[in-house]
Amino acid sequence: MANREVPVTDRYPLLNLLPNYQTPPRPIPPQQPHAPKKQSRRRLESDLDSVQSQSPLSPTECPWTILTTHSTVTVQATTQDGTSVVVTLRL
């Protein structure tokens, strides 16, 4: 019965006893607010400016080089025995 449109006075005949009774209009359900669409674009490393910096001026046992972009940080180091270490962090 809920799916069919049946006049309220047919379902509840006592409402006919009230003078000037009118079926109230159906309320409009509130709309859910929409989240703003995000602009997304995959950035390539070649599109970005990169910044390269050297290790501090003080001598260290294992000097390193840091290369940064908008989405990555790369640290390169070479130990005294010649072992090369590269660590890249992608954000």
From Swiss-Prot:
Composition bias of kind Pro residues appears in 22-33
Q: Which UniProt keywords apply?
A: Early protein, Host cytoplasm, Host G2/M cell cycle arrest by virus, Host nucleus, Host-virus interaction, Modulation of host cell cycle by virus, Phosphoprotein
Q: Where in the cell is it found?
A: Host cytoplasm; Host nucleus
Q: Which GO terms describe its biological process?
A: symbiont-mediated arrest of host cell cycle during G2/M transition
Protein's job = Contributes to multiple aspects of the viral life cycle including viral genome amplification, suppression of suprabasal cell differentiation and egress of newly formed virions. Induces host cell cycle arrest at the G2 phase by associating with and preventing the nuclear entry of host CDK1/cyclin B1 complexes. Inhibits cellular DNA replication by preventing loading of host replication licensing proteins MCM2 and MCM7 onto chromatin. Within the cytoplasm, associates with host kinase SRPK1, a splicing factor regulator, and inhibits its activity.
Quote additional remarks: The major E4 form is first synthesized as an E1^E4 fusion protein from spliced E1^E4 transcripts, such that the first few amino acids of the E4 protein are derived from the N terminus of E1.
Family, according to the entry, reads as follows: Belongs to the papillomaviridae E4 protein family.
Q: What is this protein called?
A: Protein E4
Designated gene of the protein: E4
